[in-house]
Amino acid sequence: MKKILVPITSLILLTGFDQLTKYLARHFLSASPKVLIDGVFELRLTFNTGAAFGILKGMNWLFYVFAAIVLAAIVFFYKKYSNYPKLKVIRILMIFISSGIIGNLIDRIFIGSVTDFFYISLIDFPIFNVADIYISWSMVLLVILLIFKFKESDFNGPG
């Protein structure tokens, strides 16, 4: 039971935190941006109908299909490798990625776009949200781990 309870609870808490931050952004940032560090970082509300960096605007159906495929693959991976202690960190990253996908999917389903609000003005970085952080940083760490830490044999059997 604990094997499924911890990941599901983590998924719910992470997704809930993402949704809470988006709710707060929609309610407190609608009037004007809040500059936290002048010329560096601000909270600026925007609604993104596209993917990362605003690509594929207005193609929500594509995001639904992509989210379903990726989430199915993550569930498959998680179940297949749930007894592999060496792969625990990968399973944790999968929870963060899933939470990010679900968080942005909730926005698309209920408001038709994704709520973004973090803006790094110093480098004019595209506006993003907590779910985007979950996805992007987890993917970066996952790629680094797969290239530098894990070997093919780590996926062949528990141990």
Task: Describe each PLM feature range.
Residues 1-159:
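Alpha-helical transmembrane bundles and membrane-interface segments of multipass inner-membrane proteins
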